[in-house]
Amino acid sequence: MFYPEQERIARIQNLQIPSSCKQSDYLFTEENLALAFRRGRHRTLMPGIRRAEREEYRRKLTELGLGLENRLTAKAGTLSGGQRQALTLLMATLQKPRLLLLDEHTAALDPKTASVVMSITERIVLEERLTTMMITHNMRDAIRYGDRLIMLHAGNIILDISGEEKKNLTVTDLLEKFSVSSGSEFSSDRGLLG
């Protein structure tokens, strides 16, 4: 069964997991965070954002190191791509998820900004001890982050690498393993160039 993009749902161990944690371009940064904070909770007609919540949002935004703590009342649509991606990551983790699914979450960013967002991602995942699945075509990121690397080709798992083997893996090694396992050459410049 296929769902429209905005309604796509993944089922993992009988959990329904929305495919995205989107922000509204027309809401303020703090309003987007408030909606994410209340996800899965009973909603009331109380004021939307309490002072204590606003201070908690400011503290969490300060930790990102992108100056967003001073942009609580800026509309999300006015933020840079990296700021928006970091905001979305924070929104997705305000309520600790059982599984954080990151699908090409740095693909639309320039290399410098992607590196910053990956550093923020790594810090949040480690500090919050989040089980995370990251989908990427970036070979360097696939090797650098996480405990396990699973590679797909034509819808099938062709590699499953972890432990010491993953720690010692290089992009060249990974390409060679891909060629041997799949019987074809890797053809994505984006994956090679990172």
Regions found by a protein language model. Give the residues of each.
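Conserved catalytic motifs of ABC-family nucleotide-binding domains
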Residues: K96
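H-loop/switch region of ABC-family ATPase nucleotide-binding domains
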Residues: T136-H137
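ABC ATPase C-loop
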Residues: A92-T93
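ABC-family nucleotide-binding domains
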Residues: D110
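Q-loop/switch helix immediately C-terminal to the Walker
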Residues: L27-R41
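Conserved beta-strand-loop-alpha-helix hinge in the C-terminal portion
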Residues: N156-S182
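Catalytic Walker B motif of ABC-type/P-loop ATPase nucleotide-binding domains
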Residues: L100-D103
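Helical segment within the ABC ATPase nucleotide-binding domain
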Residues: A114-E128
